[in-house]
Amino acid sequence: VKSTNLMAFVATKMLERQEDLDTCTEMQVEKMKASTKARLRTESSFAPRTWEDAIKDGELLFNGTILQAESPTMTLASVEMKGKKSPIDFAPSNIAPIGQNPIYLSPCIPNFDGNVWEATMYHHRGATLTKTMNCNCFQRTIWCHPNPSRMRLSYAFVLYCRNTKKICGYLIARQVAGIETGIRKCFRCIKSGFVMATDEISLTILRSIKSGAQLDPYWGNETPDIDKTEAYMLSLREAGP
């Protein structure tokens, strides 16, 4: 009952900030809300209460606090059993992630030099993401560049850290079945619940495969270091995706 009340409270509050959620996270919260209502109906035989009552009880239970995950693998329910609490704050940068979305709280590494050998690789279906720095921005800037070696088979997306204006990742998206799921899973490895900001070319391509994106004003007044980007992409292509 306590878990159900908490989930009702969290789902309701997160959906009140719907404009701060990307499409994938919004769908997860909606599913969370639907499953919580189903649990509420099941519990009605021994703990009858309305949805509104569950929301109020969930808020009162923690005295205006919300559980916050300690690691990417912990869900809201698993943290609840540990009894951890933190002040409730539904500002855009503090919405608690759902499921296994990572939480990033530390700042970006200031002395990143673009070296590839410390990169972290993520593979999901037709998408391969190379994360090259501990970039903890909640919103990424992407520059799309067709992969010359596989022009008709894939697209390459270079991700920039909005704090340092340096490369923070590199995504290869092949045109295969299920690529939307693959891209979403890759993005969820490095961000938490926010819309992907892109340039105009990337926006068109991402929307063509139904991945949530929005234009970024950064591209209207600044230009990335194209030479460094080209050299970086070339080194990745030579090393293989």
Swiss-Prot record:
Its main location: host cell. Suppresses the RNA silencing-based antiviral response in Drosophila cells. It is found in: Host cytoplasm; Host nucleus. It comes from the Viruses. The keyword Phosphoprotein does not apply. InterPro entries: Flu_C_NS1, Flu_C_NS2. Keywords: Host cytoplasm, Host nucleus. This is Non-structural protein 1. GO terms for cellular component: host cell cytoplasm; host cell nucleus. It holds the Pfam family Flu_C_NS1.
